Every structure is written in C-alpha cells, then in structure tokens.
A protein has these predicted regions:
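A cross-taxonomic marker for long C-terminal extensions/tails that follow the last structured domain
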Residues: 30-77, 208-212
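Hydrophobic/aromatic beta-strand patches that form the interior of the parallel beta-sheet core
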Residues: 14-16, 45, 59, 98-100, ...
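A conserved FAD-binding loop/helix module that cradles the flavin
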Residues: 85, 100-154, 160
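Short glycine/serine/threonine-rich phosphate/pyrophosphate-binding segments
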Residues: 1-2, 67
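FAD-site-proximal beta/loop scaffold in flavoenzymes
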Residues: 52-53, 57-120
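Rossmann-like dinucleotide-binding cores of NAD(P)H-dependent redox enzymes
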Residues: 2-47
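FAD-binding beta-loop-beta segment adjacent to the flavin cofactor pocket
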Residues: 81-98, 142, 155-166, 171
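C-terminal auxiliary extensions adjacent to catalytic cores
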Residues: 155-212
C-alpha cells in the first residue's frame, strides 16, 4: 500500500521481499496487485534479501510482533509470546484473565492481525464478560471470521478479494476506483462501528467464522 502511494507521487520505488509480494492474497488478487504496481512504475524483487545503500530512503516492513503482557503469576503463552486462550478467550492457566487482540492466541489458526479480527473478537469478549456479570450462559458460538480483504493500491485504485469465513479466497476480485471506494468505506466504518457500539451495546454485527 505504501509503495503504491509513493509511486503514484512519481517517486522511484523498489520493493524487495524475502518472500513474494502479496503472498497473503489469492492467485487472482496477487496478479492484479502486481499488475497495478508495475503500472505505477514499481520495481518488484521477490525472494531476495538486501542491504540498503547509504542515502537511500528505506521503509522497513518486517511484519507484526505481538504486544507481550506481563502476568503475575505467569500464564501459558505461545511461541511468539501471545497469551494462550480457549474459545471463550480465557487463559486456561488463570481463567480470571481474558485476552483479545494481537496479544492473544485463540484456538483459531485462520485469525490474522487485523481490524476485522479485533472488532469481532472485541464484541465476542464483551458478550462473554456480560454473561459473567449477569450470571447467564456464555454465547455458544464464539468463532469469528471474515468477509473480504481490502488493499489500497494508490489514491485511485484498490483491490477487494472476497473470502470465506475462514479466510480462504472464494469469489471475484474487485479492482480499480470501485475497490478503492470500498476500502475507504471500511476505514470510515471502522471508527463509526466503535462509536455506535459505545452508544448502543450489541449494535455491531459480529462476523461469524468456524466454530472453535
């Protein structure tokens, strides 16, 4: 996304990836993204490691690292330091602890760090905690999922890939200005969903995924 924005402003941009640019996308979406980057004049080098030369402006995007949360006493964590939780988002080591977001490792391998995950997991956690307070049974379905992946490819172009609830590409790929407008709508709604949920609890509609 950053490369496309810079290239659109007439900067010379080279993307170097130790893997494949857009590897998280399906084949059709990845092809469309590569085509747009070439159209903007980006040079793309896959499966390569390099050392930036002095004087070059380098934007390093090395992926996500979870925020570690110290607990006393310590709780079970995954290999990358996230708090292991069950399908009710509780630590099996200490059920008093509810963990959500990038610091948590739920039993759902399809979940990825994203606002889409955070919104639905936050709503599920709220339902679970409310059931604790009201002493009612917790929700039976705590699985969350996805509808699409949105990517910005410059100010006037985007990419929207439809996916199944477990994040597998399963439909058409939308590109161009229309896809960019969808991306902008999602960005605007993300903030609005939070505001509406604060004003009226339960108004956010959870995107359901595979049962955990």
């Amino acid at each position: 996304e950053t490369a496309a924005e810079l290239a659109e402003q007439r900067f010379d941009v080279e993307i170097v990836d130790s893997g494949t640019v857009g590897s998280h996308l399906g084949a059709r979406a990845r092809k469309q993204a590569s085509r747009q980057l070439r159209r903007l004049g980006c040079t793309v080098t896959d499966n390569h490691m390099c050392q930036p030369e002095p004087g070059m402006l380098t934007i390093w995007t090395a992926g996500f690292a979870p925020v570690t949360v110290p607990c006393d006493p310590p709780v079970s964590t995954s290999s990358d330091g996230r708090i292991v939780v069950n399908r009710f988002l509780r630590s099996p080591t200490d059920p008093r602890i509810t963990a959500i977001g990038d610091c948590a490792a739920p039993p759902a391998p399809h979940l990825r760090p994203s606002c889409a995950s955070a919104l639905s997991l936050g709503a599920v956690a709220a339902d679970i905690l409310i059931s604790d307070v009201l002493k009612t049974p917790p929700p039976s379905n705590t699985g969350v999922g996805y509808v699409m992946r949105c990517v910005s490819l410059g100010r006037n172009c985007g990419l929207v890939e439809h996916v199944s609830p477990d994040d597998v590409p399963n439909g058409p790929v939308l590109t161009g200005r229309t896809a960019r407008r969808v991306k902008d709508w999602v960005m605007d709604r993300t903030t609005q969903w939070l505001i509406e949920e604060a004003q009226r609890s339960g108004s956010y509609r959870i995107v359901r995924g595979p049962a955990q």
